[in-house]
Amino acid sequence: MIFLFNQSPLTTKKLDTLLKVAPAGTPILLYEDGVLSAKQGTAVSAQVTEAVKNHPIYAVTPDLDARGIKSIIPGIQLVDYDGFVGLVEKENPIPWI
């Protein structure tokens, strides 16, 4: 399974809930506004830095670029759209809404 997260951590606390309930080792894919969670120096940076220790976390590069995010939390893996599709095909995707 892979959790798909596309919401801004600036407008919702759903990332907090996801990180609490996701079983250790379960991948998390950040896309659309969800990539804001990957940015260093935000209110959720410490939480995401800890989460990287227990989960493979991916961020979609074109979504980071579209939002001008250059500095991401170490350990977050970058994927392009083909990588996004590959992860979703490989894992059972669960959208986090």
Residue ranges: model-predicted function:
Residues I2-K14, G34-A38:
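Short, glycine-rich nucleotide/cofactor-binding loops
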Residues G41-Q47, L78:
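Charged helix-capping and loop-helix junction motifs
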Residues I2-L4, L29, W96:
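Structural motif
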Residues P27-E32, H55-P62:
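Short internal beta-strands
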Residues K20-A24, Q47-N54:
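Short, conserved loop/helix-junction motifs that constitute active-site signature segments
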Residues V35-K39, D65-I69:
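Short, charged/polar "capping" segments at the starts of alpha-helices
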Residues R67-I97:
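C-terminal structural segments of small proteins and small subunits
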Residues K20-L36:
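Short, flexible N-terminal segments of the mature chain
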